[in-house]
Design a protein with these regions (language model features):
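N-terminal active-site beta-alpha-beta segment that forms phosphate/nucleotide-binding
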Residues: 222-299
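Metal-dependent phosphoesterase signature
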Residues: 32, 56-95, 103
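Helix-loop "lid/cap" segments that line or gate small-molecule binding pockets
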Residues: 28-29, 49-63, 121, 152-153
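Conserved phosphate- and dinucleotide-binding cores of soluble alpha/beta proteins
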Residues: 297-383
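Substrate-recognition element of Asp-dependent hydrolases with the DxDx(T/V) motif
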Residues: 13, 25, 93-123
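Active-site neighborhood of HAD-like aspartate-dependent phosphohydrolases
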Residues: 1-44
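Substrate-recognition "cap/lid" segment bordering the active-site pocket of phosphatases
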Residues: 85-88, 114-166, 170-179, 184, ...
Length: 383
């Protein structure tokens, strides 16, 4: 099902506002003789509105309503003048918003930041890419109460079934759950992927480009992929966190010879560093030759995976495809849910129009897809 409406959180989702928030709350509390706050302290205190941020930054013994009001006024005065000093969109976010607009998706923003600041930031950084912005408003409860998000959804003309709510905190996930919306947690913000999952995230995005297929195809159905792949004789294990996946792989590979093809997924899991203490590890970029073709276990990822049970890899030199067909005693594919698509054709499209352009750009290849992110079925010698 295609999604037609997006509701984004602001801080930690669209914009990295941490520096300006930290500077402003430090100004407000230092003015009254209290200790400055660090970036980390600011990060963990964000999410329930600026009053809560200020309150949590005042020492407990001085945390009266009067002092909170005074510091909050100082915070707002300073932040109003400095909210765009260090704030910036997360890399790739503007491109995602542009693509959503081109595809007819209506975008709104809901923030616990006070309304005038939220509107000013959205106007400055995103302009008409966002249709409507709501910040904290008088006499309307803040997130995770669903009142504001349901008002915003109504004004955007969306419906619950085709709307994604996207945010970086437990508050955001709870807001979506309370409103009956699909909750997408972004792992580049101020909270961990584990916290987002525990708070009700239906899916996670680890980089902005992960959001686009969620609008095209909806949230991937892991259970369908499991049924299809096990039906074809594959083993299947699902892990909610990176640490769980690493633990399983370490236990499975302990005492064995292991090799890996070119895989950014495996590098992100810490291969070979996380495995070298208990495993005879070989990586084809470092260890050339036959040994890498005849291990006990071969670890790889895939460019695409389908809910109908197909695994898609497109290789320049066939290092991964060949090793999965011949040589190793056992092959384990390690894939993020972001690679899962409804069917074979959409999995191939992911390989061509997401994986291949990203790899070409990463490897500094001068192919057309490295420029515009779309496969041209080119005859480039660097392909």
């Amino acid at each position: 099902m295609k999604m037609t409406t997006a509701i984004f959180d602001l801080d930690g989702t669209l914009l990295n506002t941490l520096g300006d928030l930290c500077d402003s709350v430090t100004y407000a509390v230092e003015k009254h003789g209290f200790p400055p706050v660090s970036m980390e302290q600011t990060r963990i205190r964000i999410g329930n509105g600026v009053r809560k941020l200020v309150e949590r930054s005042i020492p407990e013994e001085s945390r009266t309503d009067e002092m909170i009001d005074i510091c909050l006024a100082d915070f707002r005065a300073f932040y109003g003048e400095h909210m765009m000093n260090r704030t910036h969109p997360y890399e790739g976010i503007v491109s995602v918003l542009e693509t959503l607009k081109e595809n007819g998706v209506t975008v709104g923003v809901l923030s616990n930041k006070y309304d005038s600041a939220a509107k000013a930031l959205i106007e400055h950084y995103f302009g008409d890419l966002v249709s409507i912005t709501y910040g904290e408003r008088p006499n309307i409860p803040r997130k995770p109460d669903p009142t504001s998000v349901l008002q915003l959804l109504d004004e955007l003309g969306g419906d619950k079934e085709t709307t994604l709510y996207i945010g970086d905190s437990a508050t955001d996930m709870q807001t979506a759950v309370n409103a009956g919306l699909t909750a997408i947690g972004v792992a580049w913000g101020f909270r961990s992927a584990e916290e987002l999952r525990a708070s009700g995230a239906d899916a996670l995005a680890y980089e902005p480009s992960d959001l686009l297929p969620l609008f095209e195809y909806g949230v991937p159905d892991v259970s369908k992929a499991e049924k299809a792949l096990t039906g074809y004789g594959f083993g299947f294990h699902y892990f909610a966190t990176k640490d769980e996946a690493v633990s399983y792989l370490r236990d499975t590979c302990a005492g064995k010879s292991v090799s890996m093809g070119g895989s950014m997924t495996m590098k992100q899991l810490g291969f070979p560093e996380n495995f070298a203490d208990s495993t005879d590890v070989h990586w084809h970029w470092i260890d050339k030759g036959v040994y890498c073709q005849t291990p006990d276990v071969y670890l790889s990822s895939a460019n695409g995976l389908s809910e109908t049970g197909e695994i898609v890899n497109i290789d320049g030199k066939c290092n991964r495809v060949a090793a999965t067909l011949f040589g190793p005693k056992r092959c384990i594919f390690v894939c993020g849910v972001n690679k899962l698509r409804p069917d074979l054709q959409s999995a191939i499209e992911r390989a061509r129009n997401i994986a291949a352009p990203l790899n070409a750009k990463r490897l500094n290849k001068k192919t057309p897809c490295a420029v515009d992110g779309r496969c041209h079925n080119c005859k480039s010698p660097e392909r």
